[in-house]
From Swiss-Prot:
This is S-adenosylmethionine synthase. Transmembrane segments: none annotated. Its EC number is 2.5.1.6. Catalyzes the formation of S-adenosylmethionine from methionine and ATP. The gene is mat. Its cofactor is Mg(2+). It comes from Thermococcus onnurineus (strain NA1).
Length: 405
C-alpha cells in the first residue's frame, strides 16, 4: 500500500452480495414524478445561476437552491382531454448572492427562467402559462468580489461548507439495471414519439425474490392522447412490451411486469392525467425525497439521505461527495479485477479542503477466488486520483455530464 497521505481506507466487506440475497427492493421515480420535478428544478436553477455568475464575474458565487416545493394542483382528466382547474404551485427557495459590489444580480429572473425551461423539456403537456405558478423566494446575500477572489487564491481547493458524507456503490444489480433502464426507455424521446400518450410521471418499483423479479410500473397517461378505453389499453400494452424487452436484455431470471395496477374498470378508475404528472391532482413534491445520485432508491444498499440537487457545485459536499463516491465506485468495479461489489463512503469536515476528507472508506466484497490483498492498492490509487482531481466534478456538473437524481 502507498503511504497514506490522505485518509483512504480500503478494507474487505464481509456480507452477502446483493445479487445473492433472497430479497431485493429497487425504486426509481421518473422525471415527471413530483419529487423528481422538485429535484430537477432545484438543479436547473443552481446550474443556471452558476453559469450566469461565471459569465458576469468569472467565478461561481455562493448559492444553494435545494429548497424547492411542488404543491399539487387540481385537475379533471377525461378521455379526449380534460382540464386543470387549479394550477400546480412551485416555490423556489434557498439562498443566492444577489448583491455584488453594490450592484444587483438578477437571481429571481435567472431562477424562474431556468425553472420554466426545465419544465418545458421535462413535462411536455404542461402548459407553463396556465397549469403552473412559479414563485421565487430565494433568500438574498451580498458579496465583495475582491474578497471572493482573494479567498479563492488562498484556497485553490474549496473548503467544505458542511460536515457531511457521500455514499456510492457499484456495480448495479440486474434488478437495479432493469428498473433504471425501464424508466429511461419509457421517458426517452424515441418512445414518446411512438407513444405520446405516455406521460413523464413514471414510477418503477422492482422486487426480486430469489430468481423471480416483479416490476410494477405506474405511468400517467395523457388524456388528450387517448380517446377511449381501447386507446388506453393499447398504451398500457406498449408499456408492458417495452419493459419486457428491457428485462430480457438484462436478466435470464423470470420477470413479471405489472402496469397501472390501481386501475379499476368496474369503477371507471384509470390513471389518466391532463399534463402527464400527478402533481396536477394534489400530489406534492420536495427536493431530496426521491432518487439518489445514481438515479435509484436502493434499501439493500448503503445510502446517504443528503439532497444533492440544487446544492452549489463548488464546496457543498452533500452534492460533491455523493457524486465522487459513485464515480470512484464505478471505476473500481470496472478497472480492478476480482471486485464483486464495492461501497465508497466519504466524510468531510467543515472548513477543511474538500480533497482532504476526514475519511474515504472503500469497502470491497471480492469475487470468489480473489483476495483483498490484490485489490487494495489499485482501489486506493483510483480513490486518490479522483480526490486529486476533485474540482473536475464541478466542471462535469456544469457541462451536464452528471445527473443528481
Amino acid at each position: 500500500m502507498p503511504e497514506n497521505v490522505r485518509n483512504i481506507v480500503v478494507e474487505e466487506l464481509v456480507r452477502t452480495p446483493v445479487e445473492m440475497q433472497k430479497v431485493e427492493l429497487v425504486e426509481r421515480k421518473g422525471i415527471g414524478h413530483p419529487d423528481s420535478i422538485a429535484d430537477g428544478i432545484a438543479e436547473a436553477v443552481s446550474r443556471a445561476l452558476s453559469r450566469e455568475y461565471i459569465k458576469r464575474y468569472g467565478i461561481i458565487l455562493h448559492h444553494n437552491t435545494d429548497q424547492v416545493e411542488v404543491v399539487g394542483g387540481k385537475a379533471y382528466p377525461r378521455f379526449g382531454g380534460g382540464e386543470v382547474i387549479k394550477p400546480i404551485y412551485i416555490l423556489l427557495s434557498g439562498r443566492a448572492v444577489e448583491i455584488v459590489d453594490r450592484e444587483m444580480f438578477p437571481v429571481h429572473e435567472v431562477a424562474i427562467k431556468a425553472a420554466r425551461e426545465y419544465l418545458k423539456n421535462a413535462v411536455r403537456h404542461l402548459d407553463l402559462d396556465h397549469h403552473v405558478i412559479i414563485d421565487s423566494r430565494i433568500g438574498q446575500g451580498s458579496v465583495d468580489l475582491v474578497g471572493v477572489f482573494n479567498k479563492a487564491k488562498e484556497n485553490p481547493i474549496p473548503l467544505a461548507n458542511d460536515t457531511s458524507f457521500g455514499v456510492g456503490y457499484a456495480p448495479l444489480s440486474e434488478t437495479e439495471r432493469i428498473v433504471l433502464e425501464t424508466e429511461k426507455l419509457l421517458n426517452s424521446e424515441e418512445f414518446k414519439k411512438e407513444w405520446p400518450a405516455v406521460g413523464e410521471d413514471i414510477k418503477v418499483m422492482g422486487l426480486r425474490k430469489g430468481d423471480e423479479i416483479d416490476i410494477t410500473i405506474a405511468a400517467a397517461i395523457v388524456d388528450s392522447e387517448v380517446q377511449n378505453l381501447d386507446d388506453y389499453f393499447a398504451v398500457k400494452e406498449a408499456i408492458y412490451e417495452a419493459a419486457k424487452d428491457v428485462a430480457e436484455a438484462h436478466t435470464e431470471r423470470k420477470v413479471n411486469i405489472y402496469v397501472n395496477t390501481a386501475d379499476d374498470p368496474e369503477k371507471g378508475i384509470y390513471y389518466i392525467t391532463v399534463t402527464g404528472t400527478s402533481a396536477e391532482a394534489g400530489d406534492d413534491g420536495s427536493v431530496g425525497r426521491g432518487n439518489r445520485v445514481n438515479g435509484l432508491i436502493t434499501p439493500n444498499r448503503h445510502m446517504s439521505m443528503e439532497a444533492a440537487a440544487g446544492k452549489n457545485p463548488v464546496s457543498h459536499v452533500g452534492k460533491i461527495y455523493n457524486l465522487l463516491s459513485m464515480l470512484i465506485a464505478n471505476d473500481i468495479a470496472e478497472q480492478v479485477e476480482g471486485v464483486e461489489e464495492v461501497y465508497v463512503r466519504i466524510l468531510s469536515q467543515i472548513g477543511k479542503p474538500i480533497d482532504q476528507p476526514l475519511v474515504a472508506s472503500v469497502q470491497v466484497i471480492p469475487k470468489k477466488g480473489y483476495s483483498i490483498d490484490t485489490i487494495q492498492k489499485p482501489a486506493y490509487e483510483i480513490a486518490n486520483a479522483w480526490l486529486d482531481d476533485i474540482t473536475k466534478i464541478q466542471k462535469m456538473i456544469l457541462e451536464d455530464k452528471l445527473n443528481v437524481f
